[in-house]
Amino acid sequence: MSMTASKALAWAASQIGYSRWDDPLPGSVYGRWYAERHGAYYCESGVPFCAMFASWCLTDDDGNSVIPGGDFAYVPYGINAARAAGQLVDPSNAAPGDLICFDWDGDGLADHVGLVEANYGSWVQ
């Protein structure tokens, strides 16, 4: 089955309430998934998992990433891959299922990523 925005959002919604702090295994469920694909480092407890979670949500039933450039664990890498593929869009044009990146500390380097559920023009959910 191919990946759709609805499916990605359903997978994301199915994880509401998950906490890596309550996970009895090392790291996060998304870090362990990413580690199976890319190396053990990503399974460590202290590794932030937002990009790995986004990558997990945007992987089809055959295990193929539908993200430009494939899975990513570092938000700026995902941005660079989207830019290189000509798929970087202004947040005001983001559609449900698109990835949206945030620069929480205002240093010019994005440090968080999530999935757009809805776009209301001046803000996204």
In which residue ranges do the predicted regions lie?
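N-terminal capping segments
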Residues: 1-64
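...with weaker cross-activation on analogous glycine-rich loops/strands in unrelated enzymes
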Residues: 63-125
